[in-house]
């Protein structure tokens, strides 16, 4: 089985690719290595691995590559609200226009497993829990683009959309702008955190569970196709303050709540993941595991290479 992953050298892709290769799938990665990362070096060991250094916006080239692959996992993106605001033109061309063009050249029999985002729910009322049928209210440019992409994705014959919770955990291309990774990194390096709107809640998921979910959907595509799934850990709808309390179980640091400043990221929601749990998929890793993993990671890495923008 041949699988094409765009942006496969990134935070999720650099974990997913090796997991697929270990299962003997044939994997092709297209990536322009814009962060000068060497995150797929270990994967070159596998004879079932192919890597193409190219920009996914070169549509004619992409169309030739796509044809021979049964599954397509479009990970190529500028991920997160800050970088999309900072590089708005690139966010439009990569996150939005590229994906809409991609859908036009995909054959009706090819299968697409698409990462979208549960940040599309935006800001909920107190104790409101969002499921896949809830109204979307995206706040950031990133989330707004994902909503448009997901809507167009549903015009395909064979698709699955995974609305990812806030991802955390170690990866060969680790990101320090993600909330859990960022908080653990600040606790580790600075020893303190200032919290704004500390009651705002998010849902969380470990990067390896994200990859496990992609593999699960590849291996169980027929029974789950043409569906949208929230992907997070059901027990981890936590506020920023509760997240700090979890981190403090593993490292001593000071966190203080302040109200004099408004957080630019106004997302505040809880998410139900019951639909994906009903498929038989179940996350394996929790926050405690991820925090301990990150602390080990930060002990041994020169982190100046892992800024996202």
Enumerate the predicted regions with their spans.
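C-terminal substrate-binding subdomain of Rossmann-fold SDR/epimerase-dehydratase oxidoreductases
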Residues: 190-191, 195-309
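Conserved sequence/active-site signature of Rossmann-fold short-chain dehydrogenase/reductase
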Residues: 57, 120, 167-169, 210, ...
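Structured beta->alpha junctions
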Residues: 9, 134, 168, 199, ...
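Short aromatic-enriched loop/helix-cap "lid" or pocket-rim segments at secondary-structure transitions
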Residues: 39-42, 124-128, 172-175, 207, ...
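N-terminal Rossmann-like NAD(P)+-binding domain of SDR-like oxidoreductases, especially those catalyzing
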Residues: 1-164
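NAD(P)-dependent short-chain dehydrogenase/reductase
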Residues: 126, 139, 147, 151-202, ...
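Residues in well-ordered alpha-helical elements
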Residues: 60-63, 82, 89, 100, ...
């Amino acid at each position: 089985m041949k699988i094409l992953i765009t942006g496969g050298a990134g935070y999720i892709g650099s974990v997913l690719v090796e997991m697929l290769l270990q299962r003997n799938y044939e994997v092709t990665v297209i990536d322009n290595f814009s962060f000068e990362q060497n995150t797929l070096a270990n994967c070159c060991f596998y004879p079932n691995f192919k890597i193409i250094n190219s920009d996914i916006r070169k549509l004619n080239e992409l169309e030739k590559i796509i044809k021979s692959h049964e599954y397509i996992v479009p990970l190529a993106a500028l991920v997160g609200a800050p970088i999309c605001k900072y590089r708005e033109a690139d966010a439009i061309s990569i996150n939005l226009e590229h994906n809409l063009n991609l859908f036009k050249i995909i054959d009706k029999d090819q299968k697409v497993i698409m990462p979208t985002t549960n940040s599309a729910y935006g800001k909920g009322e107190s104790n409101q829990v969002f499921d896949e049928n809830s109204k979307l209210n995206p706040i950031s440019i990133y989330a707004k683009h994902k909503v448009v992409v997901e809507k167009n994705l549903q015009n395909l014959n064979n698709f699955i959309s995974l609305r990812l919770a806030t991802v955390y955990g170690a990866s060969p291309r680790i990101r320090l702008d993600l909330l859990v990774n960022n908080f653990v990194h600040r606790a580790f390096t600075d020893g303190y955190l200032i919290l704004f709107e500390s009651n705002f809640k998010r849902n969380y998921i470990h990067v390896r569970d994200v990859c496990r979910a992609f593999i699960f959907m590849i291996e169980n595509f027929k029974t789950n196709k043409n569906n949208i799934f929230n992907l997070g850990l059901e027990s981890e709808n936590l506020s920023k303050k509760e997240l700090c309390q979890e981190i403090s179980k593993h490292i001593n640091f000071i966190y203080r709540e302040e109200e004099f400043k408004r957080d630019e990221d106004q997302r505040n929601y809880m998410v139900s993941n019951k639909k994906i749990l009903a498929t038989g998929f179940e996350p394996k890793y929790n926050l405690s595991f991820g925090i301990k993993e990150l602390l080990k990671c930060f002990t041994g890495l020169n982190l100046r290479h892992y800024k996202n923008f």
